[in-house]
């Protein structure tokens, strides 16, 4: 069985070629101002299992990473908006999620450390002077939209940092080019599968350089389209799709000597915040869904109906704490750079999360 960990010497030997390849790719792509990815290390596969264009956990980053995060934020803003002095953060409308409030607080701190004035707010939060976070209140600023122009206390900021995933659709006041990430990246338009479609050719290229089968560096996945689980015919077809997918995984596992039962994640292709996700080891489990679980799978954030499902290989994590709790690395990227790593630990979950 191939263990990715055994490739350390090969990676070191190809260091210069890999660094040059990455530099070339960055020059060809307009990298986002920020994003985050969840990674699973199974030993025989190390792969990104989820990606977020509007990361909401900056409060989890290490204090020692703040200088580098600040440096990368400043570099990105200077490159795209060289005359910027004022950055406005356009947040989600979570008023009770204290963890998210702390994310905003840290994000604002990074912007201010980069040398910019920073304000926070959106029109839906105009009834609030502040949001209550874990470490106290976070002040908000009055926001209104006039003729599709976003104004903060009557003035237009130089740059809008979007920290709202736009599940319910595009919003007024965000049509200006001074908004990053682009609103078109919102969940109302973006799909989870697009991340893997974009990632796959890159993985294939780097795998050829390293000398490894790309299967060891990416999740297997496909999209089962136009499915409404309220209709029995759709559920039967989706279950059949899952069974075919799992059978192919089982064949690959057997060929590689991987002694475990394949697992598939069934995900709302537009889903977020962990909604519209379940794990299965057979299509029959979908046919046996209770009404409650079926509705949970069908709806994403904002109660949006689900028709397309991403069927994704479940990659277990071999990383764990001394007490045996599973550990999942999370990478926060700023300006195309892996700027901060932290680890998600949940003793209530198994190695599949």
Identify the function of each model-found stretch.
Residues 105-125, 175-187, 201-213:
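Structural alpha-beta junctions
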Residues 69, 140-146, 151-155, 175-177, ...:
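Active-site nucleotide/adenylate-binding loops and adjacent lid/helix of ATP-dependent enzymes
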Residues 115-154:
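A short, well-structured beta->alpha microelement
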Residues 148-173, 183:
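N-terminal glycine-rich "phosphate-gripper" loop used for MgATP/nucleotide binding
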Residues 87, 160-161, 179:
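Receiver (REC) domain switch-region micro-motif
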Residues 1-129, 232-236, 248-263, 273-275, ...:
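ATP-dependent carboxylate activation and anion-phosphoryl transfer catalytic cores
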Residues 94-99, 166-169, 185-188:
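Short acidic, S/G/P-rich loop/turn micro-motifs used as interaction or catalytic elements
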Residues 54, 164-167, 268-271:
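Short glycine-rich anion-binding loops that position phosphate/pyrophosphate groups of nucleotides
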């Amino acid at each position: 069985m191939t263990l990715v960990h055994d490739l350390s010497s090969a990676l070191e030997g190809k260091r210069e070629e890999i660094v040059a390849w990455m530099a070339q790719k960055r020059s060809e792509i307009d990298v986002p101002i920020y994003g985050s990815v969840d990674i699973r290390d199974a030993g025989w596969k190390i792969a990104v299992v989820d990606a977020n264009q509007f990361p909401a956990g900056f409060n989890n980053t290490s204090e020692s990473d703040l200088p580098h995060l600040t440096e990368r934020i400043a570099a990105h803003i200077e490159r795209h908006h060289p005359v910027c002095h004022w950055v406005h953060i356009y947040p989600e409308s979570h008023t009770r999620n204290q963890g998210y409030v702390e994310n905003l607080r840290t994000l604002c701190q990074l912007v201010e450390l980069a040398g910019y004035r920073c304000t926070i707010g959106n029109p839906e939060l105009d009834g609030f002077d502040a949001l209550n976070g874990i470490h106290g209140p976070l002040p908000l600023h009055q926001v209104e939209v006039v003729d599709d122009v976003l104004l903060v206390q009557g003035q237009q900021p130089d740059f809008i940092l979007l920290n709202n995933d736009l599940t319910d659709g595009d919003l007024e006041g965000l049509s200006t080019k001074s908004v990053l990430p682009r609103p078109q990246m919102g969940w109302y338009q973006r799909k989870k599968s697009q991340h893997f479609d974009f990632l796959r050719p890159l993985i294939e290229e780097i795998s050829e350089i390293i000398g490894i089968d790309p299967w060891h560096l990416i999740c297997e996945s496909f999209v089962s389209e136009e499915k409404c689980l309220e209709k029995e015919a759709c559920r039967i077809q989706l279950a059949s799709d899952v069974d075919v997918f799992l059978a192919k995984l089982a064949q690959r596992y057997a060929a590689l000597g991987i002694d475990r039962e394949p697992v598939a994640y069934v995900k709302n292709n537009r889903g977020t915040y962990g909604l519209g996700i379940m794990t299965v080891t057979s299509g029959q489990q979908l046919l046996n869904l209770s009404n409650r679980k079926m509705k949970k799978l069908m709806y994403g954030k904002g109660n949006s109906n689900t028709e397309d499902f991403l069927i994704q290989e479940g990659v277990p994590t071999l990383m764990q704490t001394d007490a045996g709790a599973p550990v999942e690395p999370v990478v926060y990227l700023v300006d195309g750079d892996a700027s901060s790593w932290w680890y998600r630990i949940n003793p209530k979950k198994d190695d599949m999360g």
